[in-house]
Amino acid sequence: MVLNVSQRGFQRRLAVVEQILQSHDLRALNISTLAYSEEYLYPFNNYLFKVELATPALSSSFPGTQPGTTQAPSDGISVIVIKLSNPAATGINNTNRVENDVAVQYLVRQSMAHAGLPQLVPAVYAWMPTTITNAVNEKSFGWIISELRTGVDLDSEFSSLKMQDKEQILEQMANVLKAIQTVELPEGATKFGGVTFDSKGRIVSGQAPLRAGEPVKSYAEWRVSKLRGQLQEVAQSPVIQGWKHNGVDTRIEKFLAANGPGKILSDVDLHQKNLIHGDFKTNNMLFDKDTKKLTAILDFDWSYISNPLDEFMCSLQDVGGNIRQEGKEIEAAILSGDFTWPPPNLDKESVEQWQVAKAWSTAMKKCGVVSPCNIRGVDEIRDLLHLQALLCPYNLGNESMLKQFDDKKRAEMRAKTEAELIQWLEKHGF
């Protein structure tokens, strides 16, 4: 049997977990995987291990002196989670990835405490940054030791819950999102991008986990950097070939050189920003089936600072809150904030989707969440995002997707995308 990429390194990762424990004078009674499947063919973003300790970890092991960490409770900790950050994960920038993850969790914990909410973000006890980006050398993986939270995966239960229970959970989610949006950004962390720690342990601006490059001062610069990132990717694509055919690449460069993005975003508040979770979905939440209460908000691996609209473009797909993946009727209601009248002739599944999206919209309003209908220039931002999507569409830029098509189909998809790209450029005078 051929082992996939994750199985091949399993024993090496297990050895790293043992070494991490030894470095903290701890010994495992049992080590098991979390959210792991041997059938999954692609590299995991992270490898999670549940560690049951032979003796409780005390403050001597976890003193809470490292930036962003919490001291072990006086009665100790018997079970911990160790997360190994996989530098081979697709599209990940490892520069200050672990630091960003830890710092964001620390800020959200503070914000939730300030809001008087239950502490749903697990405490972090220790961490280590990635030292190299060699995917084979597991000893150099960055890692985080954190508190284990109990509960079942919300995504496995949410669709089967009664509407009343869904509404209760959606309100809890809205309160959490409000706390994330209202995180007080430290004085040194006010740029668009990620966060990290400086030499004195203070949280400052840093690189974002899904974008290589230094943080920037405005949203226009942020969106340009995203476009540049797409262009770098397509330059390496054997199918797209940097859009050089028919001189499309030259037209794209003219658009960028003429401050095209800035002109499109002229009605946008280019300095409006807050913390973005980046993957705020039910599969990153745990809840108690009996009380219907959330017990954990997880996975801040993709978090960054940007315009609040970004959250609604990369999260909330499973509760009717994403403006890029919903049906047209729900999308229009999200953008307007008006769910008064459902569209006619909906099938049963669509009715349920509408009801959940409406309940989520109601919860956001009740909890004071900044939503798309409250944000200036949404249409202009989405227009620029359309360009970004055309520059490197998933079915042309992803190696695994390309393997599913023959040369003729690839050429057809490329030609279709090129035509749409030219149409977009012509609409904007290029």
Could you say what each language-model-derived stretch is?
Residues 1-39:
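Juxta-kinase regulatory segment immediately upstream of eukaryotic protein kinase catalytic domains
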Residues 7, 11, 38-42, 91-99, ...:
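Alpha-solenoid helical-repeat scaffolds
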Residues 37-233, 237-242, 268, 272:
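ATP-binding pocket architecture of kinase catalytic cores
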Residues 44-52, 180, 256-310:
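Active-site acidic catalytic loop and adjacent metal/ATP-binding pocket
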Residues 89, 132, 153, 285, ...:
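Conserved protein kinase catalytic core
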Residues 127, 148, 169-184, 276-288, ...:
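Conserved beta-strand->loop/alpha-helix structural units within folded catalytic cores of enzymes
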Residues 167, 229-233, 302-307, 311-318, ...:
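Helix-rich C-terminal or lid/interface subdomains of diverse kinases
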